[in-house]
Amino acid sequence: MAMMGVWVKIDEERVVQALQEAGEKLDSIEGEMALDLSSLRRIDPNALRAMEEFADIADTKGVKVVLRGVDVGVYKVLKLVNLASRFSYVS
């Protein structure tokens, strides 16, 4: 049975691993997945690559991804690398 929505907290110490785990859950989700990024104050190149891969998988599966609690600096980096428009945002 597919889940209608999932909320995942992303820890700054294990961003890549958490995004990979969230990506594995996308098979069983219909609708949307919310990622809580409130603990992230910076994002490194490996995490950006993982975000892009996660967005690709979500797009393929038709799952809307909502980012919650995004730091302004993190948002600016997502915008610079053209990832910001692939997500929705809530405070």
Please report, for each region that a protein language model flagged, where it lies by residue.
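Short amphipathic
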Residues: 1-9
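Amphipathic alpha-helical interaction surfaces in cytosolic regulatory modules
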Residues: 10-87
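Short, charged, intrinsically disordered terminal tails
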Residues: 89-91
